[in-house]
Structures are given as structure tokens and as C-alpha cells.
Regions:
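Short aromatic-acidic-glycine turn motif
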Residues: 231, 374-381, 454-457
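Polar, glycine-rich mid-to-C-terminal structural blocks
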Residues: 311, 332-342, 347-409
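Subset of Sec-pathway N-terminal targeting signals
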Residues: 8, 42-169, 501-535
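N-terminal secretory signal peptides that target proteins for export/translocation
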Residues: 1-21
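Sec-dependent N-terminal signal peptides
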Residues: 8, 20-34
Length: 535
């Protein structure tokens, strides 16, 4: 009984208080119907037969200070953006953030736990977005290249609160393309001379080469103390030639990544394919040490090139000196995505199984703005997206860069909600008039995006009605909320002191679903590893 279509007609409407972009108001895609209809649902359709908390162990969390003698990789660098605290809806009714489809934090966390290293750089949204969810996909003739799904249920770690799960699902239909113009930009500096770096890099790119054909071209640039062009616009079906270059790579020297980036973008521009997919794929540990090397210096360089229509994908490798903050910044400012490759299986996931998502953009500069109804929500906080938050006025600013979403990608965000007391006052936005003030809506999701290559945005609006609340959330909700709870426990969030890895594990294990690739089962195993290490 999973709702599969937009509930209500698609109609044109003027955005309340907005005049900037074409706006459509769409009835939110509810992952569940009204609560009364849920009693007949069974586990087979993703719904839980048991109540939400039945049989769940409420053991305490394992805070980071209990990691005893577990070492930390002190040379690794991560972004330290502060976690968002609760916001009062009466004074801050809007929450705005840029979309993010990166998944690097999850595979890096997996590497850290398997290595026996205390977790660092845990970004909630990247853990959640690592997994697939059964969101409805847009119809082939849909006006917008995505759907929006909202579901709200009780918070597992704070039963007096609620959790809102918002999912933006992009169409899996990739744009018509004249072929791929791809530049491999490969770090072959001395720091890459480790089995889990350059050899894994070469094997990973061999997998990618197998996905290409005669309509594609590949250039290969390497950099260490200086950069070198090893291939220039080689047809994709000359796989043997490309693989031979990859197998002969050797590491040595310093890391002049900025010059390598410059050369890679120049090659991409020289071979630019109008109507095609033009992309630089950077593979590195991020340890730039010659020339511009800080995230700020590199993003200044990247932003100029991002305007040219050339996208970037960043693949991180290795451990010990990983500069996660640098690689994430390059991807965020370069119209790109960022994945961390810890195993060949992960390379296969990113470069083969998710090839279209990694390579083809269907929505550019996608921003999300959530407007909360003070009649139903007193306070809220966004879980994750700590370095993707935007000022509210930046939502309408078409010059403000945001995240790009690939074919088949999904963007999932969780909000923790404090319910309003009965008779709460209303704000002066969508819920300002008397009739709206009596609304039982929880929130309204505004999504703003550009078609690839367009200069102006379109805004679509998805209200979340009272019917999206359920006491029997879907297996997707239960699993994803378990990922969130585990992340909160690992990071020792002061706003979720009761977050429990034990409870997260039990909920995740009970919500594995089909799990075709075994990724959800693997997550359960990672929680076990975490608890063993933390003692």
C-alpha cells in the first residue's frame, strides 16, 4: 500500500511572497496514507506489523570518549562545521540548504572502523544518502525531473519529538548526450605509493573504462611535482590502450594538484562536446603540498572552471594523510560529487552500478527550503548538511551555487521536530492568514532547481499534510532513521544524548528490506564493529 503517484492535480500557482521563478505547487507524495488505512498493511509492502518501538532495546550510547586506546589519524583533515541546534519556528520558520549527493563519509567511516581508528568526519547526510530508498520516480513526461516524498513519525531517541524524512528522487532517465568527454586527473605523487592508493586507483579506473564506447573520449593527466598528459582525447573503445596507461602508473614526488587541475580543465575545454557530458574525474588522497593547496585556494580555482560547463567528480583514496575537507570543497564548488574508494567493490558501486548518477546531471543548483507551520511544529533542527546550509534569502538567488543531482540520485534529509502546543501562534508566511493558521500541515517543502545549462531556476512546492504522520513507518524510514541515530551516537551529539547504537542496530536489522547488494546488512555489521572497538 505504498503511494506511487502525486496525490492531487499538478497546477500552476504563484509562490506566496515570491516572484522570482516559475513555481508549481504539487501535493506532497506521501509514503504512507492516512493512519487509519495503515492497519491493513503488512511487512511485505515495507510497513511494520509491530508498533514502532516494540521489542527495541533502549541501551545507552557509546560516547566517543570511551574509545580508550583507539588511535586517531592526526594527519587526516576534515571539515569542522558546527552541528545545527534547535530553531524556534516563530522566529526562524525557514530552513534552507543546498542538495548534496556525496557519499564519501560513509565509505570513509567504514574504512576507519575496519582499520580500528576512531571515527572522524562523520556527515549524517552522506551516511543516509549512501543507501537506496524506494521513493516514487517521476513519470516519463513529468515537468520536473524529480519527486518529493515526506513521511513523519515519532523520534526513536526522543519519543516526545518527531522525525520528518524528506526524499527528493531524481529521474533515472539520463539526458540525451552526444557522448562523454572525460578527463582522468590522477594523483601519482609519493603519498599515493600505498596498496590502497595508486594500485586501487588504477583498478578502479579500469572498471570505468569498461563502461565507455566509441562515442566517448578519454584524456589522462597525471600530477606529482609537475603534470603530464598521457592521453589526449582517446576514443573510449580503445580500452586496451587506456588500460595499459593505467597499469604503468608509478608514484613519486610532491603534489602539485592545482596545476594538474588547470591542465585537466584546459583539456576538457579543448575537447568540449556541445550537448555532451564534459567531466573531470579527480582521483587523489587530497594531500596537495605544492602551489595552491588549501581548500579556499583550490575552490577559487575550481569555481571559475565550473562556469564553463565542465563538471567534476572527486574520488578519494587512502588513509593516514587523507584531506577529506579539501576533496569535499573541490566537489562542492566545482558542480561535482565526492566519493571515497576504500575497496574495489566501492569503486564498482560508484563507477559501474551508479555510472549514470555519477556522470549525468539532471538538475543543477538544487536547493531545498522547508517552511514549518507553527500551529504544528514549535522547534526543529536539520540533521546533517552542516556545511551545506544557506541563508534563507539565498534560496531565490540564481547566482548562488548549490548541489547538482545526477540521474537516479536521491537526496534525503531528516528534521527532528518538537511538536507545537495546541493553539500556537502562526507566522507571516504561508500560514499567516486565519484559515491557514488552522492548518494541520506539518511543513511545506520548496525545491528550486535549474535544468542543466539553464541560467534561471524553477520552483516547485510540496505541502506535507497531516496524513504523512504515521505510527507505522516504512522500512525505508526505519532503516534511514537508524543510520541517523548511529551517526548521532558516533559523533556524541549534544542534541541527542539518548541516541543509541544498540537501538539503531536492532531497528536497522529489522528493516533490511530486499537489500539486493547487501549494503544494509553491511551497515549492521559496522555497528557491531563500532561497539567492539569502543568497548
Amino acid at each position: 500500500m505504498r503511494a506511487r503517484s502525486l496525490m492531487g492535480a499538478l497546477f500552476t500557482a504563484k509562490a506566496r511572497g515570491r516572484e522570482k521563478a516559475p513555481t508549481r505547487v504539487v501535493a506532497a507524495v506521501a509514503a504512507v496514507a492516512v493512519v487509519g488505512a495503515l492497519a491493513a498493511c503488512s511487512g511485505a509492502d515495507g510497513m511494520s506489523d509491530a508498533s514502532y518501538h516494540e521489542g527495541i532495546a533502549y541501551d545507552g550510547s557509546v560516547p566517543p570518549e570511551q574509545w580508550r586506546d583507539v588511535p586517531v589519524d592526526e594527519q587526516e583533515e576534515y571539515d569542522d562545521s558546527p552541528e545545527q541546534s534547535f530553531q524556534d519556528v516563530t522566529t526562524s520558520p525557514l530552513s534552507t540548504f543546498a542538495s548534496d549527493v556525496d557519499t564519501a563519509s560513509y565509505s570513509n567511516l567504514r574504512r576507519q572502523l575496519r582499520q580500528g581508528v576512531a571515527p572522524e568526519g562523520v556527515r549524517i547526510e552522506e551516511l543516509v544518502n549512501y543507501f537506496d530508498y524506494d521513493y516514487p520516480t517521476p513519470d516519463g513526461d513529468a515537468e520536473d525531473p524529480f519527486t518529493v516524498t515526506t513521511q513523519i513519525a515519532e523520534s526513536p531517541w526522543s519519543p516526545d519529538h518527531q522525525l520528518a524524512m524528506i526524499g527528493v528522487q531524481a529521474t533515472a532517465a539520463k539526458p540525451t548526450s552526444q557522448g562523454n568527454n572525460i578527463v582522468f586527473l590522477l594523483d601519482v605523487s609519493g603519498s599515493m605509493d600505498e596498496p590502497n592508493k595508486l594500485p586501487l586507483l588504477a583498478d578502479s579506473f579500469e572498471l570505468l573504462v569498461e563502461q565507455l564506447d566509441e562515442d566517448d573520449t578519454v584524456s589522462i593527466v597525471t600530477y606529482a611535482g609537475s603534470d603530464q598528459v598521457l592521453a589526449d582525447s582517446v576514443p573510449g573503445d580503445r580500452r586496451g590502450e587506456l588500460v595499459e596507461i593505467l597499469r604503468e602508473l608509478q608514484a613519486g614526488g610532491s603534489t602539485g594538484g592545482a596545476q594538474g587541475l588547470q591542465t585537466a580543465y584546459e583539456l576538457a575545454a579543448e575537447n568540449f562536446v556541445d550537448g555532451g557530458n564534459n567531466r573531470v574525474i579527480l582521483a587523489t588522497d587530497g594531500d596537495f603540498n605544492v602551489g595552491p593547496s588549501t581548500p579556499e585556494q583550490l575552490t577559487d580555482l575550481i569555481e571559475d572552471h565550473a562556469k564553463s560547463g565542465v563538471y567534476i567528480s572527486v574520488l578519494g583514496f587512502g588513509m593516514g594523510n587523507l584531506k577529506d575537507n579539501t576533496m569535499e570543497a573541490i566537489a562542492d564548488h566545482g558542480n561535482g560529487n565526492y566519493a571515497y574508494i576504500d575497496t574495489l567493490d566501492e569503486a564498482r558501486k560508484v563507477l559501474v552500478d551508479e555510472f549514470d548518477s555519477t556522470m549525468f546531471v539532471v538538475a543543477q543548483d538544487l536547493k531545498v527550503q522547508v517552511e514549518f507551520n507553527p500551529a504544528t511544529v514549535a522547534e526543529y533542527r536539520l540533521l546533517g548538511y552542516d556545511n551545506r546550509r544557506l541563508e534563507d534569502e539565498e534560496f531565490d538567488d540564481d547566482t548562488k551555487d548549490a548541489g547538482d543531482v545526477g540521474a537516479g540520485h536521491a537526496v534525503t534529509a531528516f528534521y527532528e521536530l518538537v511538536p507545537a502546543r495546541e493553539g500556537a501562534p502562526v507566522d507571516d508566511l504561508d500560514y499567516q492568514d486565519v484559515e491557514s493558521g488552522q492548518s494541520t500541515d506539518f511543513l511545506t517543502v520548496h525545491v528550486r532547481y535549474k535544468q542543466p545549462g539553464a541560467g534561471t531556476s524553477t520552483e516547485v512546492v510540496f505541502p506535507a499534510r497531516a496524513s504523512v504522520f504515521t505510527t507505522r513507518p516504512t522500512s525505508d524510514f526505519r532503516f534511514a532513521s537508524a543510520v541517523v541515530e548511529f551517526a548521532l551516537a558516533v559523533t556524541g551529539s549534544p542534541h541527542a544524548e539518548d541516541a543509541s547504537p544498540t537501538r539503531a542496530r536492532e531497528r536497522a536489522e529489522a528493516a533490511l528490506g530486499e537489500d539486493s547488494y547487501g549494503l544494509r546488512s553491511e551497515f549492521v555489521g559496522l555497528i557491531d564493529t563500532y561497539q567492539e572497538l569502543a568497548g
